[in-house]
Amino acid sequence: MFETYQPLFHEIFTQVNNAKDKPKKVAVLRKHDAEGLRNFLMVAFNPDIEWMLPEGDVPYMPNDAPEGTEHTMLHHEANTFHNFIKKLVFGTTDQWMIGNTQINDARREMMFIQMLEALSAPEAELVLHAKNRTLNKKYKGLNANTVREAFGWDENFIDQNLVAQRGGKPVDLGRMPQDIAESQRRG
């Protein structure tokens, strides 16, 4: 039967927390697999991704509207995280790739605060845990190893099928699929 209700991320992570062992935790993540969830967990656990925001508390007003009303969902907002991060790209020269170079730090911080205020309070809290790298402290068993196993990612958080397809060439590790496609076009 097709399920029309899409649980919020904190509901999914509570299911992971309550699962008795790692295979069940992995099964919960696989059951709810979606691009937004993958993006969120990537920025939460990949050590090669750094948040381009000040350390510490964020001055925002939590949204007190009931869940499911008057706010955006993290499922959708997770696809905008490129505005707030930079990623270490491995290849012939290791360098940081900024997700969105078109915005300055003040605008980036304002956009982040606006995103938090538009989310429900529990989902905004999840984003802060991801930013502070403390998600695994709130949800037992939700860690880098579990996430990598659930989504078939290698130790560099790259899809193992993509690595196998590319022959495991070191220059491709850490690159985004669109970067690989662009380099293939160039020859």
Description of each model-found segment:
Residues M1-G187:
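N-terminal nucleic-acid-engaging modules of covalent nucleotidyltransferase systems
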